[in-house]
Amino acid sequence: DGNIVIDSRNDKVWPMTWYGTVIKNDGKTGFVNRKGEYVIRPGDYDVGDLDEINGLLVLKDGKTGKSGIFSVETGQQVIPFRYDGITFAGSDRLVVEKNGVRSLYNMRTGYSVFSVSTDMTIDPFLHDRLTWVHQGSSNYEVINDQGQILFADKEGLIEEARPFSHGYSAVKAKGKWGIMDA
């Protein structure tokens, strides 16, 4: 319709989502709905991941450096600022970091299903119920969404791996690419 929903006086405006968008102005960050109304009041936050499926936003408290999660529908804080880091790892999984431990959580139950040290990476579950866990470009393992290790590269042959799709992943070993299943 050509109506201005959010005026152009802000320091930064993120791309619009189904729920609305993040706005930063005068050093304060908030979330507004598609009508331009604040859902999450401006505060001293850094912006993290946005889960557009579940309407959740990771914000890091600028004073404590701890991360929490807010609902972008209601503005309610659903996970307090207590974690060193939070990333969404799929439609019902998230990865949290606290005290040198990186844990994969089931968002429905609230329970950790897998944990490693923070020098390891837990890749997101994109279009599958499988993902890679690795330490840089080594120590590759495949886990399912329940945290069970299905494969471990004990010989250290894998140099790089792509996300799983339909149970298969592109994998680089000895400088060449191939496809493997879990």
Task: Mark where each language-model region is.
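Residue-level detector of conserved, function-critical positions
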Residues: 1-182
